[in-house]
Amino acid sequence: VCDGQLMTEIPGIFSCGNALHVNDLVDYVSASGELAGKSAAHFAAHTRDEVAVTISNDFGYLVPQRLDRTQDNSAVTLYFRSAEVLGPCRVVLTVDGNEVWSRRYPFLRPPEMQQLTLDFDKLGIADASDVHFEIEVAKA
């Protein structure tokens, strides 16, 4: 489990690259290494205010699983895989039960990692906010 700055549940310990999750491209490995390094430097000088990011069972995983509200969350890169092969579907983000973002996919497959970047700073996330991703499968 890590947050949007790649810090694990152990304060001051950061994870990146394939130690965090299996990446499809080496470019993603390098980008996560840079983010982890910058985040470690920020951690040394600041306190944290975290909120959990939860997912539905249709996800195999989603990274990050937490957001630190004291950080710049205007361009958080998320990576996820579906738990199973899915036909036409929609990934939906809700904050406190209100839909705030969605994206349609013609299909999702577990071997294919998906990447998206979201501006969480504009979503009004508070201390006790429920930040949740789910996959809605289109009905035939």
Region annotations inferred by a language model:
Residues 1-23:
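FAD-site-proximal beta/loop scaffold in flavoenzymes
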Residues 8-10, 16, 27, 88, ...:
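Residues in flexible loops and secondary-structure boundaries
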Residues 72-140:
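C-terminal catalytic lobe of FAD-dependent flavoproteins
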